[in-house]
């Protein structure tokens, strides 16, 4: 009998503009949910001059690593959206991918599963909750 060892990854993706202590709860949830699988925190590339996305990607990554050194090696910046992230993860050899989002975003992010088998292929792909968002997290 052949034993198949699937390579799994858990990830989250967000603006994190700017990174806050409230985001740390999301980061912890990704780590804890991964249970032995690889896990990453993707920082969006979004930046504008309107005030809601003031940090450019490099500056945001710098602050995230300074604020959360325990998560520093798991931060990634580059792919601009969840589909691009999943394409990247597939090229890295992952078989299973779990997109971890706040409970208020689970339904809204189900659309990524429509691309499985088209733009990328994962044996298992799901969108799961990191838990309820802390309204007071700053």
Locations of regions flagged by a protein language model:
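Nucleotidyltransferase catalytic core that binds NTPs
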Residues: 1-138
